Amino acid sequence: VLQIPCIPVLDPIIGALGQYLGTRGHARPGSQHVMNAEYFSRIEAMQFALTHDDGQSSWDLNEADVVLLGVSRTSKTPTCIYLANRGIKTANVPIVPGCPIPKEVFEISKPLIIGLTKDPKRLVEIRRQRLRLLDQDENTDYVNLEMVSQEINEARRLFSKHEWPVINVSRKSIEETAATIFQLYQDRLDTQF
């Protein structure tokens, strides 16, 4: 036994709050982290987002609540993780020049499909930073403004063809993008019932 003294510094505060509110506090550590249905829904959504990141496991995309499509560096993954933390099962599929989009994207009916786009100049800046961090050559179409503009235009045409809502994430935080997606998702649920 270490014989370290325990000083209950919060007891006076909890006692005063209890007196003020006319109730007694219960000494149950961890009560703020209740494992209820909402908690398990968030865990399931998080597992789904991780399993369906970057176009993986496309065979069961119809199980998603939301599917995000976008070119590289449009914040698809962090947005999915943020939404999953709110209990929304979200998958993301990249749009990569020369690589076909999984056919399942065009066959699904349940999920809300949303396109993410970004200003080409801003996208080139972000991609350049990424290449520098990875110590990669910057002489590539990945950061060529003309090619990136073409990439974004092709993505926009795809979104328009399928009448998928589009969010320009150029000047939005992950939280703002997620809030917009959540509102679109709620609107869709409201019209289904």
Predicted ranges, named:
Residues I43-Q56, Q136-T177:
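Small-molecule kinase domains that catalyze NTP-dependent phosphoryl transfer to phosphate-bearing small molecules
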Residues I7, A91-V93, L112-L116, P165-I167:
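Hydrophobic/aromatic beta-strand patches that form the interior of the parallel beta-sheet core
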Residues Y20, K110-Q150:
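A glycine- and Lys/Arg-enriched "phosphate-lid" helix/loop adjacent to the NTP-binding pocket
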Residues T90-I101:
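Short beta-strand-centered segment that lines the nucleotide-binding/catalytic pocket of NTP-utilizing
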Residues Y185-F193:
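Short, charged, intrinsically disordered terminal tails
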Residues L2-R42, R122-I126, R130:
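Long, charge-dense
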Residues I43-T90:
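Internal active-site segments that recognize and position negatively charged phosphoryl groups
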